[in-house]
Amino acid sequence: MSEDTIFGKIIRREIPADIVYEDDLCLAFRDVAPQAPVHILVIPKQPIANLLEATAEHQALLGHLLLTVKAIAAQEGLTEGYRTVINTGPAGGQTVYHLHIHLLGGRSLAWPPG
């Protein structure tokens, strides 16, 4: 259950986070182990483990998350571009089972990442 993850604890303010954005649907905070000068996680407040669990009823929420990433990127001054990543499941490298979008930027990012 994604309510019991570290992200659920951040949403409930049980543990601290460097929050950069919040609205009724989502929360965004700086990653504690950044992989780029700007590394922010955007998460829904609604508990969804990953994209495998997303349904058509989540369509508006998923769109909202992406537009929130765009707004935060602008707020952070990422005018030259940025990367968004959603890891899904063990084979996709997901370690926290609460859907989240990584926003990475502030430097040139190589491909493939690893």
From Swiss-Prot:
Pinpoint the HIT domain residues.
Answer: 6-114
Give start-end of the signal peptide: none
Q: In this UniProt entry, which cysteines form S-S bonds?
A: none
Motif Histidine triad motif extends across: 98-102
**Which Pfam families does the annotation name?**
HIT (PF01230)
Entries under SUPFAM superfamilies matching the protein: HIT-like
Q: Which GO terms describe its molecular function?
A: catalytic activity
Protein name from the UniProt record: Uncharacterized HIT-like protein Synpcc7942_1390
**Species this protein is from:** Synechococcus elongatus (strain ATCC 33912 / PCC 7942 / FACHB-805) (Anacystis nidulans R2)
